[in-house]
C-alpha cells in the first residue's frame, strides 16, 4: 500500500527533497509512525511530496510527476492557505475564490480520472495569531468550498480548522499548537498526525 502526502509547507515540514520517503518534521512523520505501530505487518510505503509555498495552481502543475506517475493507493491533500497568504504583502498574487475552487476541482478530477487512489482531504486552518486574523474571513469563505469538493470527490475529509477550534480552548495557552497561526509546532504536528491516523485507519484496514 502506498500513501502519498501532498500539500504545502505544513506537509513539507523540512523534509529531505532528495528522498521522498523522508517524512520531514511535520504531521506526515507523526501519522506514519502511528500507522506503522498500528499495522506492523502491513507493507505500507509512505511518500511525502509537499512543497513549501505551494498554492493550488502550483500543485496542479506538478501533478503528473508528483501524483499520477506514482499511482498511490491513498493521496492526502492539505492545500489552500497559500492561495490566501499570497493575496497579502508586497508580492501579491490575487487568486480569486473561484480560481482556487477551479484549481482544486481540477486536481481532484485528474486524480479520479488517472489513478485508482482513495482521496483524503485535510482542510486548511488558521490558529490563534493576531497578524493572521485578517485572513480569517477569506478562509471562512474557502472552507465551505473545500467541504463541498470533499463531499463530491473525497473518501475521507478531515476538517482541521473545526477540529483545532474545539481543541485549542482545552490547551494551556493560545499558541500551544502554532507560533505563527499557520505552521504547526511539534504539538500541532503531532495533533494533526493523530487526527490523520484516526481518519485513514478505515482505508488501511480495508486494504491490508
For every predicted segment, state its role.
Residues 30-45, 58-208:
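Alpha-helical cap/lid subdomain in secreted, periplasmic
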